C-alpha cells in the first residue's frame, strides 16, 4: 500500500508505507566534512548511503522540513512531492533559513553554509574555533523503482576545532647587541635589538599572542606587543659586565600563540667586550733599622675587573715599561715590581733622610703602576 498526497496543482503522489529512506545524523567537524570541489563553504552529504530501495532509487527532492500544517503539529511532506532534480542532475538552491541553502547534485545533497558563516564572522569552515558549532536540519525524498516516494529527516551537526597557529619572523630583524666596554662602560657599542613576529591562525579571533610570563632576560630586558608582534630588547650593561672580550651569549624570549598551538623563540645574540680593570692603591710599611726589610706583597691582589676570568699584568711602573722587573730607586728606598704584580721594597737605612727620622715620624715613598 501507499499513502497518496495531492499537491497544489492537483497532482497525486504516493508515499510508500514501507519506509525505504532512513533518517540521517551527520556528526562532523570542520576537518571531517566533505567539501564541494573548489569551495570552503559548501559541504556534500550522501543522504542515500543508508537508504533501502536498491539501485533503482534516486534522490527526488529536498525541503526545509518545516510543516505548513498547524492542525497536526507534525511535518507534512507535501513540499517533497515536487521533484527538484532537473535533467542535469542538479536542482536549484533552496533556502532552509539562517543563511543556509541546500540542493541536489547528482544523487547527493550539497549544503551551502556561506550565508551562515558570514553572519557569524567566519570566512570559511576552517575559521571556526573550538566551541563553535553549526546545527541544521532538512528533509528529503527518494523515488523508488515502483514510482512511489519515501522520505526521511537529516540532522547536520558541525563542530569547530582548534586549528594550529603559525608564527614567523618578519625579515630584517636586528638580533645582535654588543656590551659596552672600556673604563666604566665608557666605550658604547650597540645595546639594542628589535624585530616583529607575524601570527596566522585560521580560527577567528586567535591571530594574536599570549603575554609572556616574564620579559626579563639574563643580560637585558625585552618588550613585546601581543597584538602586533613587535618586540625590542635592551642590554643591561651591569648584567653584561662580567662578559669577556668576544664572549658570545644569548638571551631568549619564548612567545606563544593565543591558543597555545604554536611558540617561537626570539633569540638575541650578545657579544662581550673588555672592561677596563680598576687598580686599587696598595699600602705597606717598613721601619727604620728594623726587620723585616725588605717588605713584599702583590699590587694586583686587590685590583678588580668585572670581566669573568680576566688575568692582569703590570705593564708599566712610574709610566715606563722598562721599570717592570727592574729596581726603581725612590726617595727612601728601592722598589722592584714584577709583571705578575709581586713586589719588594727595601728601605735604604744608609740615607741621611732616613736616619734623621724621629721616633714615630712617618714619610712615604710613592710609586705608580699600570
Residue ranges of each PLM-predicted region?
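Extracellular ectodomain surface segments
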Residues: 2-96, 166-215, 278-330
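Acidic, turn/loop-rich segments in luminal/extracellular domains of secretory-pathway
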Residues: 3, 83-160, 184, 215-272, ...
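Long, low-complexity ectodomains and other extracytoplasmic segments of secretory-pathway proteins
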Residues: 14, 156-171, 266-279
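Acidic active-site catalytic centers that drive phospho-/nucleotidyl reactions
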Residues: 51, 144, 163, 201, ...
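Basic, gly/Ser/Thr/Pro-rich low-complexity segments located predominantly at protein N termini
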Residues: 165, 200, 225, 234, ...
Amino acid at each position: 500500500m501507499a499513502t497518496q498526497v495531492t499537491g497544489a496543482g492537483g497532482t497525486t503522489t504516493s508515499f510508500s508505507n514501507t519506509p525505504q529512506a532512513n533518517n540521517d545524523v551527520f556528526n562532523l567537524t570542520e576537518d571531517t566534512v566533505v567539501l564541494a570541489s573548489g569551495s570552503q563553504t559548501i559541504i556534500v552529504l550522501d543522504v542515500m548511503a543508508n537508504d533501502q530501495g536498491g539501485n533503482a532509487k534516486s534522490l527526488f527532492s529536498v525541503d526545509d522540513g518545516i510543516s505548513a500544517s498547524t492542525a497536526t503539529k507534525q511535518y507534512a511532506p507535501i513540499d517533497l512531492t515536487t521533484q527538484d532534480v532537473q535533467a542535469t542532475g542538479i536542482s536549484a538552491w533552496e533556502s532552509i533559513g539562517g543563511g543556509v541553502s541546500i540542493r541536489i547534485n547528482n544523487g547527493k545533497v550539497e549544503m551551502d553554509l556561506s550565508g551562515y558563516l558570514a553572519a557569524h564572522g567566519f570566512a570559511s569552515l576552517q575559521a571556526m574555533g573550538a566551541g563553535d558549532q553549526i546545527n541544521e536540519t532538512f528533509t528529503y525524498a527518494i523515488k523508488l523503482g515502483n514510482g512511489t516516494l519515501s522520505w526521511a529527516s537529516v540532522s547536520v551537526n558541525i563542530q569547530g576545532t582548534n586549528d594550529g597557529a603559525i608564527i614567523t619572523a618578519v625579515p630584517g630583524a636586528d638580533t645582535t647587541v654588543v656590551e659596552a666596554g672600556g673604563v666604566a662602560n665608557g666605550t658604547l657599542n650597540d645595546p639594542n635589538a628589535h624585530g616583529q613576529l607575524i601570527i596566522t591562525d585560521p580560527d577567528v579571533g586567535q591571530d594574536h599572542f599570549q603575554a609572556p610570563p616574564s620579559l626579563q632576560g639574563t643580560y637585558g630586558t625585552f618588550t613585546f606587543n601581543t597584538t602586533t608582534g613587535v618586540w625590542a630588547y635592551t642590554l643591561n650593561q651591569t648584567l653584561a659586565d662580567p662578559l669577556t672580550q668576544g664572549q658570545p651569549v644569548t638571551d631568549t624570549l619564548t612567545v606563544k600563540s593565543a591558543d597555545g598551538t604554536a611558540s617561537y623563540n626570539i633569540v638575541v645574540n650578545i657579544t662581550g667586550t673588555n672592561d677596563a680593570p680598576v687598580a686599587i692603591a696598595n699600602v705597606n710599611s717598613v721601619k727604620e733599622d728594623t726587620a723585616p726589610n725588605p717588605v713584599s706583597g702583590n699590587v694586583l691582589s686587590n685590583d678588580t675587573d668585572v670581566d669573568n676570568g680576566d688575568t692582569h699584568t703590570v705593564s708599566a711602573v712610574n709610566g715606563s715599561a722598562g721599570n717592570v722587573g727592574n729596581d726603581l730607586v725612590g726617595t727612601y728606598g728601592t722598589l722592584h715590581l714584577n709583571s705578575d704584580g709581586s713586589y719588594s721594597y727595601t728601605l735604604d737605612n744608609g740615607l741621611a733622610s732616613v736616619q734623621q727620622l724621629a721616633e714615630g715620624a712617618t714619610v712615604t715613598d710613592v710609586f705608580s703602576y699600570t
